[in-house]
Swiss-Prot record:
Official protein name in the record: Phosphate acyltransferase
Domain of life: Bacteria
PANTHER family in UniProt: FATTY ACID/PHOSPHOLIPID SYNTHESIS PROTEIN PLSX (PTHR30100), PHOSPHATE ACYLTRANSFERASE (PTHR30100:SF1)
Enzyme Commission designation: 2.3.1.274
Enzyme class: transferase
Primary role: Catalyzes the reversible formation of acyl-phosphate (acyl-PO(4)) from acyl-[acyl-carrier-protein] (acyl-ACP). This enzyme utilizes acyl-ACP as fatty acyl donor, but not acyl-CoA.
Swiss-Prot/TrEMBL catalytic activity: a fatty acyl-[ACP] + phosphate = an acyl phosphate + holo-[ACP]
Organism this protein belongs to: Pelotomaculum thermopropionicum (strain DSM 13744 / JCM 10971 / SI)
Compartments reported by the entry: Cytoplasm
This protein's record includes keyword Cytoplasm: yes
Family of this protein: Belongs to the PlsX family.
């Protein structure tokens, strides 16, 4: 399996991207294609023993965070994210991973790979830790404004993602709202509620913010505006908890002694809240596997994002989404949504 990596995208590119790619190549025995400035990439590879698992595709241009995504993707045909996407489109790579501009990664995927038939809006599937495991959250930032049938499509794709990648037999799908009652929500969520009821997935109804973290659902559906706010708030809360904990521990020598005793548990706690453990989030709904990473991804996060890409390919996630969406014709509010999803 070959995975294309946008080696120039991210706050710590190309060094951390290359390090993460090498870790993944060695651990998962994958063929990695690093896409970016060849001179810089060879310099980074010179610091390690890359072996025969890594190749370079030269891409002299980089799309910066401040650039307009769609305009930049059209103008910079030789940028690392565009070149990496083309490798997937042309069948030279099975998936791509990028820690660069989320907007550029989305635009490159839409222009280069296209949408799956029946999907109007691709969605980013983020992951949040909960008391019992994790919650898939989508959309996590791709679509600020959504129609009811967009949320329906997100629910179907999230259901399949949780089932295929996380091994959940019958994922519970909830619609994020301001109350559990069927009558709660705005015009969009009220309409989406009834569409999701008929979609042939395990829809459990409306959920509230606390349900994202108590393990009552496996998939939470919302628009990209709400999803991105939730995701960033979760990251901020996790960081604040660690800082508060450190401050409290530093106030007492007894607490410091207790910390030594509790070190294994604290490490486990930190690991569960660390976004790097989950790697990247797939852009579901495009005709290819595209994994989007946090802009500040370290080598560990990049390695785990590549793992997500590998698992998505091995579990035939794209094929399952395509066949399921087409079979139930999730094309709009008036679609036929009575067929069960296997």
């Amino acid at each position: 399996m070959k995975i294309a990596i946008d080696a120039m995208g991210g706050d710590y590119a190309p060094r951390e991207i290359v390090k993460g790619a090498l870790l993944a190549a060695e651990q998962y025995r994958l063929n990695i294609i690093l896409v970016g400035d060849e001179e810089q990439l060879r310099a980074e590879l010179g610091r390690s023993n890359a072996g025969g698992l890594v190749n370079i595709v030269h891409a002299p241009e980089v799309i910066e965070m401040r650039e307009h995504p769609a305009v930049a993707v059209r103008r910079k045909k030789n940028s690392s994210i565009v070149k990496a996407t083309q490798l997937v489109r042309d069948g030279e790579a099975s998936a791509l991973v990028s820690a660069g501009s989320t907007g550029a990664a989305m635009a490159a995927a839409l222009f280069g790979l296209g949408r799956i038939k029946g999907i109007d809006r691709p969605a980013i599937a983020g992951v949040l830790p909960n008391e019992k495991g994790l919650t898939v959250l989508l959309d996590a930032g791709a679509n600020v404004d959504c129609k009811p049938y967009h949320l329906l499509q997100f629910g179907v794709m999230g259901y399949l993602y949780a089932k295929k990648i996380f091994g959940i037999t019958c994922p519970r799908v909830g619609l994020l709202s301001n109350g559990e009652e069927e009558t709660k929500g705005n015009e969009v969520t009220l309409a989406a509620y009834h569409l999701l009821q008929k979609a042939g997935i395990n829809f459990v109804g409306n959920i509230e913010g606390r349900d994202l973290f108590n393990g009552n659902v496996d998939v939470a559906v919302c628009d990209g505006f709400v999803g991105n706010v939730v995701l960033k708030a979760g990251e901020g809360l996790a960081g604040a908890l660690f800082k508060i904990m450190k401050e409290e521990i530093s106030k007492s020598w007894l607490a410091k002694i207790g910390t030594v005793m509790a070190e294994p548990a604290l490490k486990g706690f930190k690991s569960r809240l660390d976004y790097a453990e989950y790697g990247g989030a797939p852009l579901l709904g495009v005709n290819g596997i595209s994994i989007i990473c946090h802009g500040s991804s370290t080598a560990k996060a990049v390695k785990n994002a590549i793992r997500v890409a590998r698992e998505s390919v091995e579990n035939r996630l794209l094929e399952d989404i395509r066949s399921s969406i087409e079979s139930i014709e999730v094309k709009g509010a008036g679609g036929n949504l009575v067929q069960e999803i296997d």
